[in-house]
Amino acid sequence: MTRSGHPVTLDDLPLRADLRGKAPYGAPQLAVPVRLNTNENPHPPTRALVDDVVRSVREAAIDLHRYPDRDAVALRADLAGYLTAQTGIQLGVENIWAANGSNEILQQLLQAFGGPGRSAIGFVPSYSMHPIISDGTHTEWIEASRANDFGLDVDVAVAAVVDRKPDVVFIASPNNPSGQSVSLPDLCKLLDVAPGIAIVDEAYGEFSSQPSAVSLVEEYPSKLVVTRTMSKAFAFAGGRLGYLIATPAVIDAMLLVRLPYHLSSVTQAAARAALRHSDDTLSSVAALIAERERVTTSLNDMGFRVIPSDANFVLFGEFADAPAAWRRYLEAGILIRDVGIPGYLRATTGLAEENDAFLRASARIATDLVPVTRSPVGAP
């Protein structure tokens, strides 16, 4: 569309003042031979899963003229069954809420427990959607730094929570982009001092060597919310399904802020089909962990500094110019992630042949390594 012969831009629109100058979130989506930038499970769904999804969606399509189950009860019951089996913690549909990806879950949580006059704290570098969603809900964003190895210094974190008294505390475990998990004793230290809601983001929980924070929900019912996704280990990124685990009162709060019929019939049917094949899908986790360790050892041997990871990716450096190094990988046909940390890049653990290509390129690029000043900042 044009105005007086000139294209209409954002400057011509009555955009909110706090959105001016901002850039949209999103990893590059490029057609390259090796894509290791968005932490997906590289193993495609099995034929049995694909057939089940097709059959389930076909059955759901019969009623596409009707709205879906607005509370997604059957899906939530299936998620509760999966989590009970995985964690050993007895959960019911009343403990689960589901939405279109964990980002929508996080947005709903901030709509309910954040907002104008309230604040949220995160320990950076961490998942960059936490501050973006905070900004979008007019929740004041507070940053506290991690240790030099990008791990969570629990004493520093506790002091920051005590000092700033945030309404929402974000704790990513494993953390993205550094990969470290937080132990249950350290989580308890933070939960003990959190004045409001603590959100433990377990997007990569299936890869973690630590027990899930789900085991603490009963002990901290008015404080703890655990968020998860089917986009990572579950190999369901295209299906867009996230969920949370909490006391039933938190689900009641979600009902106050969710949009009506937010989960389509198709999404619910496809996700339930995927859950029926969880054992087959998650059998790839052990192989991905083994590949992650192989990549870590190889990068270390090349002279890179590799942050020990408990997820399906590695953060590595130290580059004199990380953006330039990122471009060199891209020129080699390999897409990884510049997460905004000076001197560092992040690479998803791919299939063995993808990791081989990544390591061959890394061996060539390793000659550019020099020490850099570390500066933990917010990262995608």
From Swiss-Prot:
EC number, as in UniProt: 2.6.1.9
GO cellular component: peptidoglycan-based cell wall; plasma membrane
BP-aspect Gene Ontology terms: L-histidine biosynthetic process
InterPro entries named in the record: Aminotrans_II_pyridoxalP_BS (IPR001917), Aminotransferase_I/II_large (IPR004839), HisP_aminotrans (IPR005861), PyrdxlP-dep_Trfase (IPR015424), PyrdxlP-dep_Trfase_major (IPR015421), PyrdxlP-dep_Trfase_small (IPR015422)
Keyword annotations from UniProtKB, A to Z: Amino-acid biosynthesis, Aminotransferase, Histidine biosynthesis, Pyridoxal phosphate, Transferase
Sites of N6-(pyridoxal phosphate)lysine modification: K232
Top-level EC class: transferase
Protein's pathway: Amino-acid biosynthesis; L-histidine biosynthesis; L-histidine from 5-phospho-alpha-D-ribose 1-diphosphate: step 7/9
Necessary cofactors: pyridoxal 5'-phosphate
Activity regulation annotation text: Inhibited by 2-(N-morpholino)ethanesulfonic acid (MES).
One example GO MF annotation: pyridoxal phosphate binding
Reaction(s) this enzyme catalyzes, per UniProt: L-histidinol phosphate + 2-oxoglutarate = 3-(imidazol-4-yl)-2-oxopropyl phosphate + L-glutamate
Protein task: Aminotransferase that catalyzes the conversion of histidinol phosphate and 2-oxoglutarate into L-glutamate and imidazole acetol phosphate. Shows lower activity with aromatic amino acids.
Miscellaneous information on this protein: Was identified as a high-confidence drug target.
Family matches, as NCBIfam families: hisC, PRK03317.1
Family: Belongs to the class-II pyridoxal-phosphate-dependent aminotransferase family. Histidinol-phosphate aminotransferase subfamily.
Free-text comment on this protein's domains from its UniProt entry: Hydrophilic residues in the substrate binding pocket and N-terminal lid allow the entry and binding of the preferential substrate, histidinol phosphate.
Quaternary structure (record): Homodimer.
Name of the protein in question: Histidinol-phosphate aminotransferase
Source taxonomy: Bacteria, Bacillati, Actinomycetota, Actinomycetes, Mycobacteriales
